[in-house]
Amino acid sequence: MKTPCADATKIVQQMKYSLHFIFASKQKSDVTIGEFHTKVKQQQKGLVVLVEEDDCFVSDKNTPVSLDWVSGVNSSLPVYILQDHSQLVFLYAGAHVGIIYNHTSNSQHLLQGHCSPISCMCVSEDRRWIGTADQNKKSTVILWDSYSGIPVHTLFDCHPNGGVIAIAFSGDAKQLVTLGNERAQCVCIWDWTNDCHEPLWLTELRPEYGYQNYVIYNPNNSTQLLSSSESQVLFYSTVSSGTFDLYCETHKLAGGPLSPSVFHWREFRILTPSRAGVIMVWDLTQDLDSNQRLSRDHVKIISLQEHPITVLTVVDNCIVTGDTRGHVNFYDENMLLLTWFTQLNLDPIVSISFSKEFEREYLEDGTLDTKPVLGRNFVVSSSTSAVVHVNMERSTWRVLLQENCDPLHAVACHPKQPAVAMGNCSGSLKIWDYREKHHLRCNLKSGLKDGFELNADTFSSRAGRYLAVGFASGAVHFLDANTLQSDPKECFDYPPDSISHMSFSHDSRYLATAVSCLAVTLFRMQQPQWIYLGRYRSHYKPITDLLFGVHQDSSKPRLFTLGVDRLLVSLQFSKRLEQSAVPKCMTWYPPLSSEEFLVVASDQYKMKLFNSMSKTCRKTLLGPTYGSPVKKIGILPTSENNESGSHYMAYVTEDKVGLQILPLDGNPYKSQAVVCHPTGVSAFAYSHDGLFVFTAGGPDCTVLSWQISYSALEGAAALGGKELEPYYTLLEGGRNGEFYREIEDFFYYCQIHNQGLESMETRQLSPKIPLTELPSLMRALAYFPTEEEVEDMLNEVKLGQYTETGEYITDINLAELIKLYINHRPAFGISAEELITAFEVLGEPGGPAGKPVLDRDRMLELLQVRGEAMSEDELAECFTGLFGLFEVKEDENPEADFFKTDNVSQEYTLESVIPEKISIEIFTHHILGLPSSSPSLTPKKGHKGSEQQLDDD
């Protein structure tokens, strides 16, 4: 230990520091920046419901998808010890969930309520109350009862312009302070125990104060607070008169940035550590004025140690520090070393939390207030997600948690056992028993090359004997699933292409991998080892999925790959599946009919069934619409708990995990989803019994285990109603709305049109219309399908029962029409952004403010050459209808008259009605005749599409 020395004087001389104050009175009118807006709330009856400490946590598993376990820790947030007497219980965060972990019983109680990652949390001095907050645009602060695990109060939109970066309870836990993440940061104090939705005090900090990221109350005085950043410390005071004092120290510390500060336990002082091993002691006085700068004789600099101090806290008249070496030191108020813990084998320390009770009774003579006492157990967390418990009386410690501290992109379930493999970007691999909740085997880079990022893994399909692991370097290793060891002969390195997908064949004899170079690599088991067969570049854009199947006429495996280029590829064929949508994933559809189908999900919220032999689209269905398209799907195995005998599909979107009842039919009530990883899902897998789904969160360094309840999903689906009732909710106005009446009118008009508009015979009403009327009817309902989409739609109805009856369907009723319309139309219509993108791709800058414009001749050429090319007759018919042109006389050539100006009246030429330069507004309003839209029709600056994108789309 280093005592104060002469070097401290030099440090003081090199520092520039100041301290000033701000006062503001309680008043309703606004005050200037840096002053406080006081909002007085009447005292109301408290909302906190007391629960006994021995009450059990209650978990709600009556939802289709419920969170069961969180594997992983947010290492940037502190870990708090809640109980350390008969049971060891502590609190930490992972992703958007708070976790109360009972180490004694190996159980978790999960604090769910946030839709964004938890950015900060705190506990009260008595460990009774917990506060969690996030940084979403609609930031939320939730206060929890640590005994029951239920939320007791929620603050919505408390910092809407950036979220919350720090929170803290007052010493008596009656108030809560929040520090915002806004551009101009705000500090708010809340009377949370009452029905409070507005802060008692609020101030906006000046930019020169720097970015504050930490705030606490003085535990002995609830009218005093401090906040700090890496370069500044602010002190606040609220008194009965309503004044709010702010002390600011601005300096440039020679040794390094500051760490979070604390209050002295007895004196009116603030202790501020630095990354240079220095502690600054601020002696404050009660007679400071607003914006006053503290003189130098009020600041003491103590050079405590050589290594950076990352954590400083005070407990029982002791000063406790944690540093970058993972050491914990205890000092008295004179900075004399009392004890130390240097053998914890930790990386830089993030937090130190002490138990609220002693291991045994100390100091019965009542000298605890004056003498330092080393009697409380504590937990220490590190930057690498390790949590260690230290028993002070026995001077022993044990590791409580050693979780992932790197992004997770690989997860796979064993085909026969309750085991799931998890791999992260540091090359670490773990196998976890999701029934007993403990790790079975770990491979922390042993046998794996250092620096390898583990991107994908999968178990062999039969007994799970092998575990194939793919790395970002392009390497593929075959590991023994029981030992996680590999034979050097079964480690294949093909740099530098990253492995993105892996799949075993049904007989576990083949393994296929997809790499970032758009190719597929194939391996085969040739006893006694795996061998490399070859690599095939099957796509010209990234591969989104690959899948093994079995030939219908043999037991030989066949391999399918799916790409962003919209191609479905196997060794025998290649077929373009979509015109504009991008397929995201695929899987085998369960045998619900005599045909074998591949189900493919696209970025347009659609799911399509393709015949595995003919590759024709047999059905188009509306998929889950929960904010982002489905990116991965899997058919869950039938379990013993599945009383209905139905089939189910699990899926993940960008940030959600969900469950879908099969068969797919577009019913929105047959699907449920919940937020799983707000920062994005990187991988998912499901258990062999279909009762658990696992999601990897990538950058949030967590794997979440989700328990499935099929009965809850079936119950939710039943609430949606029968027959067409669920589909009416997807129509504007519902069953009794104007749009539904329009559908009925058009439906019966199609019957009249089919019977002849000028027919004088008695009309024969029918519950069905012929399929020939379907394309026109869809366009009348403002859905404009392409010719390929029309063909898919007609085939879907025409061949709907062909495999069962051998007959074609030639007509359709109103109920089937409504389902067909809902499933085929764009899920969210045509957006202005899509039109803007099209003009950016096709046009050239030349309009006002650099907006893209399209040349008239260029547009006509594109319509006749690209995509589904139109003939001149079709163009003439379209523009005649759009512009209301008169019909051409019988003795005139319609093709020549419409496109040429020779010997033709000006009223029939395109030049007279279409401007030479076409902007987005002209195309939308003048040509298409659509109503004026919002100002959102503004192209993104600096963006220009390419001909390659045009060819693809």
Predicted features, each with a name:
Residues I100-Q108, K138-H153, R183-W201, F235-C248, ...:
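Per-blade loop-tip surfaces of WD-repeat and WD-like beta-propellers in eukaryotic adaptors/scaffolds
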Residues S76-I81, P117-C122, N161-F169, Y209-Y217, ...:
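Canonical WD40 repeat/beta-propeller blade segments in eukaryotic WD-repeat proteins
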Residues S71-G72, L111-G113, F156-H159, T203-P207, ...:
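Surface loop/turn motifs at the tips and blade-to-blade linkers of beta-strand repeat domains
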